[in-house]
Every structure is written in C-alpha cells, then in structure tokens.
Amino acid sequence: MSSAYCSSAVAVSAAATASSAATFNPLLSSHSNSQLFYRFTPKSFKLVANCPNPLILHSNIRRHRFFCAAETEASSADDEIQASVEEEEEVEEEGDEGEEEVEEEKQTTQASGEEGRLYVGNLPYTITSSELSQIFGEAGTVVDVQIVYDKVTDRSRGFGFVTMGSIEEAKEAMQMFNSSQIGGRTVKVNFPEVPRGGENEVMRTKIRDNNRSYVDSPHKVYAGNLGWNLTSQGLKDAFGDQPGVLGAKVIYERNTGRSRGFGFISFESAENVQSALATMNGVEVEGRALRLNLASEREKPTVSPPSVEEGETEEASLESNEVLSNVSA
C-alpha cells in the first residue's frame, strides 16, 4: 500500500473528526478503493503508528483502534476488532467478578466463626458442660460449651456459651430452649452480646476449673486426637477402668479457652502407665481414636519444648514442663 494511500486515509479520518464532533458514533465510511474502520472519541488523540499496519490511537480516557484495510479484507477486519474488544471486556468483567467473589468469601469466612455461638443464661448452678452439651445436642452439632465460674468461689455464675455447628442449628437451639426448663430453672438463650473482657473471663474460669481437680505425677500419658468437647472429667472417666489413675486434664488455648485437642493423664506408677498405653491406645472416645504416648517431665526446662513430628498439628506445642518421649505405644 502506497504512502499516498495512507495519507489519504488519515485525511479522511481527520475530516470525519472535524465534521462529526462529540455526537459521532463508530461507523463504516465507504470509498471507491478502500474502506476505513475506526472508533471515534471527541477527546484529543495521538497518532502512534502508520498505515498499512493498524493505527493505534490513545486518548486521555480510553484506548481506541483505527484500522485501514482493503475492500476485500474489510469484513474480516471488523469481525476481528469486535471479537478482540468483546474478549477484552469479558476478561475485565470476569476479573471484577472474581475480586468480588474473593472479598465476599473472606467476609463470609470471618463472620462464620461466631455465627453459631449462643448465650445461655439462668442455668442451674450444678449443671456441667457435658450435661449442657447433651441437651443442646438435640438441636444439632455442638462445637463447644463454656460455663462461667466465679473467680473467688469457683462456683458457677449460672450462665455460659454454647457454640453450634451452624447458624441454622443455633437458631433451632434458640427456638427449642429459650424459656424452657432446665434443672428447674427457666433458661434464656439468645445470640450473645459479650462485654469487653468477657471472653477472657470465660477462658480463665474454664482453665481454672480444668486444673482444679488435676493430681500431677511424674508418671503421665500424653493423649492426642481428643474430641473438641471432651472435658478433663470426661478424659478421666475414659481411663476409669485403668489401675492407678490419679487425674486428667485437657489443654486449652490461653486466648480463646477452646480445647487444643490433647491432654494428660497421671498415674501412680510407671507400671500403670505402660498398662494404659497397651490397653487404651487407639480406643475411640467420643468418636475419635486416642493417640497415646509416654510423657515425661523436665526438671529444669531451659529451652522451648521440641517440635512434634510432621502431621501432629494439634499437638504442635506442649506446656513448658511437659514433653513427649520417643517411646512409641
């Protein structure tokens, strides 16, 4: 294609620009020997390429493409332009939708952690977490139960929190048990409005209650893969048929008061420990198979407890004075 032809095409473009002003729409302009396809914007633009290659023009708003083509190639060029633009816009729309989906997923994930949490008030002072879990189990899956105890007297304050597996189950539990009778008292069940510091109080009372009846001993068994609702008393009861059991404790998160999925059982002698390892390892407690190991006590811990083997994520760290031995059960 000659330079004179290109100059003529550009001149036609300039003439169309001057005559059509801001109301001009993209169209096909026919000539005797060629056809000019272009998109027009009323803003100023800059020529950055010359015919016969596509003319790429840039404005201060959006990029526009001008094409010069022979008469026999006009239809295919127009199709390619339209397909290219549609593909670009489709990719942009998909990108925006993807970002919105990711953001929505993040918000849903952040909100879902507390959706099933319920406040339960006016409880009988003698009710235990295990008993409350069994009651609310009629409404669905119970993830966690926390009863609040007085700091000084270690007596139940008559309220607590129950976390259900989903928001639907929480609503079902609220409908079933709000204003119902439990142990001769009319309980109140609703979604909690916990005052500042309330969660820390729940955590402290739960851990204090957990350690209150534990009898320590140098002869201990480490128990992993515990059910999330298993209490220290429940763990001790599971070993009730074993000789020489002194106590049991489940380890909880310091910040949240939730079970970490492992604990310890203390015994009177090393023989009792070996007997429990041989008998109870792999036994199911609340639907989960116990993973037992011999635990030993450090007299003067000077370093952090060693990391456990790969895959033991819930047992990633122990209390500072307790470690796992290399003895396999």
Curated annotation (Swiss-Prot):
Listed InterPro entries: Euk_RNA-bind_prot, Nucleotide-bd_a/b_plait_sf, RBD_domain_sf, RRM2_NsCP33-like, RRM_dom
Region (Disordered): 77-117, 296-329
Localisation per UniProt entry: Plastid, Chloroplast
Major localisation: plastid
GO molecular function annotations of the record: mRNA binding; RNA binding
UniProt keyword annotations, A-Z: Chloroplast, mRNA processing, Plastid, Repeat, Ribonucleoprotein, RNA-binding, Transit peptide
Bias kind Acidic residues: ranges: 77-104
Pfam families registered for this protein in UniProt: RRM_1
GO cellular component: chloroplast; chloroplast stroma; cytosol; ribonucleoprotein complex; thylakoid
Transit peptide, from-to: 1-69
Domain RRM as annotated: residue spans: 116-194, 219-297
CDD domains assigned: RRM2_NsCP33_like (cd21608)
Gene Ontology biological process terms, A to Z: chloroplast RNA processing; chloroplast rRNA processing; mRNA processing
SUPFAM superfamilies on file: RNA-binding domain, RBD
Function: Could be involved in splicing and/or processing of chloroplast RNAs.
UniProt protein name: RNA-binding protein CP33, chloroplastic
Protein species of origin: Arabidopsis thaliana (Mouse-ear cress)
Source organism phylogeny: Eukaryota, Viridiplantae, Streptophyta, Embryophyta, Tracheophyta
Annotated gene: CP33
